[in-house]
């Protein structure tokens, strides 16, 4: 089977044609190249999904609409998307086109978790919350021709047990900034933030050794790359933050 992991372009994100105002903002500011690169960063959750599902598929392809177009001539058995609200309208458009081809569609991430009913109008299966446990459950159901329409995570995921992202799927020559998630959850439950709704109020983080392992892997795959910590709040635990920063300093990072 062949799986496409698609990161949809979004309003106000990246450097695609629809975001000309973003380009104008970049051009109006000096020394802003790092912001441009950051906004064109790869989709970290999808790379983790690829690791979780790799044993179920013969072939996987990661497609980032911020750097390339979808090749509608290619054939896939399944399409997976992870997206935020500013990407939702485009995600639904993509889903509609693949639906016409009879491709099975699955979705997760911030928007599907917070708006599952809306997302189910366009996708065959929606994942609410973290997918490390529910994704393999879904695949087993799918292979037995009895997939559910919605899977909700009810377990607390140990961050050190999260599979290493499939960075090897990236077209590395198109990226300078590589994403790295080291924690999930936040105790503050701010009204403007969806983090607690997706990951819960308990702050969970990878060990410093695990973080450094991932950084070393990124450096081997993409030397001299920028690393973007995608965490919603990586400074919740002061002792951990200091330990991590000391480790980064020791490695001259």
PLM region descriptions:
Residues 8-11, 84, 131, 198, ...:
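Flexible loop residues that form catalytic
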Residues 45-161:
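Glycine-rich beta-alpha loop elements in corrinoid/cobalamin-binding modules
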Residues 2-3, 125, 225-227:
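Beta-sheet entry/capping signal
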Residues 6, 82, 106-108, 181, ...:
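A cross-family glycoside hydrolase active-site/sugar-binding cleft signature
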Residues 3-38:
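Short glycine-rich His-centered loop
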Residues 10-12, 67, 112, 233-234:
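Short, glycine/serine-rich, charged loops/turns that create anion-binding
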């Amino acid at each position: 089977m062949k799986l496409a992991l698609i990161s949809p372009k979004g309003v106000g994100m990246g450097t695609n044609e629809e975001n000309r105002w973003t380009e104008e903002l970049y051009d109006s500011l000096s020394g802003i190249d790092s912001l441009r690169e950051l906004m064109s960063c790869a989709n970290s959750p999808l790379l983790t999904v690829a690791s979780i599902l790799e044993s179920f598929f013969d072939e996987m392809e990661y497609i980032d609409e911020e750097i390339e177009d979808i090749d509608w001539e290619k054939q896939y058995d399944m399409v997976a998307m992870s997206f935020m609200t500013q990407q939702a309208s485009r995600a639904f458009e993509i889903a509609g086109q693949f639906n016409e081809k009879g491709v099975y569609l699955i979705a997760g991430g911030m928007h599907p978790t917070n708006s599952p009913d809306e997302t189910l109008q366009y996708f065959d299966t929606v994942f609410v919350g973290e997918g490390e446990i529910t994704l393999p459950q879904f695949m087993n159901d799918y292979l037995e021709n009895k997939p559910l329409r919605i899977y909700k995570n009810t377990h607390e995921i140990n961050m050190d047990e999260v599979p290493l992202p499939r960075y090897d799927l990236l077209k590395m020559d198109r990226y300078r900034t590589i994403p790295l998630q080291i924690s999930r959850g936040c105790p503050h439950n701010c009204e403007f933030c969806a983090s607690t709704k997706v990951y819960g109020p308990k702050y969970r983080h990878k060990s410093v050794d695990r973080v450094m392992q991932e950084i070393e892997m990124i450096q081997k795959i993409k030397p001299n790359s920028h690393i973007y910590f995608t965490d919603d709040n990586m400074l919740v635990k002061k002792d951990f933050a200091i330990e991590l920063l000391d480790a980064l300093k020791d490695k001259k990072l």
